[in-house]
């Protein structure tokens, strides 16, 4: 804005904001594939306001992917953007954008937009869950825990993220039917979840179950765990 109050807007940013459009402003966008992740994250943040990505920007992103630009992304940069995106209001739009840009098959080939994991992520966001719980909810229905380990290793996810995701993936089905378990089976579950040493992880585990099954109430399971700790 000039001294006289005149807006200097060579890229028509004000017009795009009013139209709720996310658009790249120069050819330099194509020089850094991290910008694909970043604009996907921005859509995850502003989608609820009605924002969308400009057609020409999406076309450029698709061209960048076709040219192999995302193949060279540094693992830590991918994780940084993923972790931030998980905490946005509509984290599923991060993945939807990457799918539209044809980058999902390269960056996250085992994550599907139409699987229960994505629904659990959406519910986790609605519940204002922490990022670590959202991550575990997203991956809960992965068919093989080795896939989760490979994903976490590939992008150097923090150990607490991978540990919770693996725990939820392996034990969520058993935990959801906990009231049907025998005392021995319940004890086996608690020992597997390491409730005596990993209470915070156990609490996150219960929160993840709330995202996976809308009718789940972790109070009973939490009380059982507390009673067991009292006895030991």
Task: For every predicted segment, state its role.
Residues 1-155:
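Glycine- and charge-enriched loop/helix tracts that form the active or gating conduit
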Residues 110-232:
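C-terminal subdomains that position terminal phosphate/3'-OH groups for nucleotidyl transfer/ligation
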